[in-house]
A protein has these predicted regions:
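Aliphatic-rich helix starts adjacent to a transmembrane/signal segment
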Residues: 1-40
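Cell-surface, membrane-associated systems
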Residues: 41-170
Length: 170
């Protein structure tokens, strides 16, 4: 009876952790979606086709092995106090990407055997616009990263966009 109670308790606590992790991810997504398309008033960067504020690429779901991909682009400014007056501000763009790949997490089944879970892990990348190459890149400074796992064990990630009138797009 102890084993049954212990297994039930573990399942309940695991579900609570998953639920909290999901809420944390949604909060993070909301903060970044609010930044989409932001530009400073004096921003002098030329617009580019890669600077789409929000871009959603539809996935095929768990059966197809892919989930939706979300790209968010927003403006920022780098300040250099040692630069000459009038050249201290350099405007830039950041691209945040959320994407999925098959999870590699292994779970232990009630009979003691192990199997890889049937789900995705969510990866996040943060890239900065490189004016010299006209592409988003990592490695330009230590705040950038590529495909860092933010959440494991997700059944699917689906984004449903709406227009200004509340009608579903796509």
């Amino acid at each position: 009876s102890y084993t049954i109670v212990n297994n039930t308790y573990r399942q309940v606590t695991d579900r609570a952790k998953l639920s909290q992790a999901g809420r944390d991810l949604i909060g993070q997504l909301l903060r970044e979606i609010r930044m989409a398309g932001y530009r400073y008033v004096n921003d002098d960067m030329a617009p580019d086709n890669d600077h789409v504020a929000i871009k959603i690429t539809k996935g095929s779901g768990l059966e197809g092995g892919t989930c939706d991909n979300l790209q968010i682009v927003y403006g920022s400014v780098d300040y250099t106090s040692t630069a000459a007056e009038g050249e201290r501000y350099e405007y830039t763009r950041y691209q945040i990407t959320y994407e999925c790949e098959k999870s590699t997490q292994v779970e232990t089944l009630p009979d003691g055997s192990k199997q890889t879970i049937d789900g995705f892990k969510i990866l996040k990348s943060k890239k900065k616009w490189d004016i010299a190459t006209n592409t988003f890149k990592t490695g330009l400074d230590d705040t950038l990263y590529e495909e860092e796992m933010v959440l494991d064990y997700v059944q699917d990630l689906i984004f449903v966009p709406f227009d200004a009138n509340g009608k579903q797009i796509g």
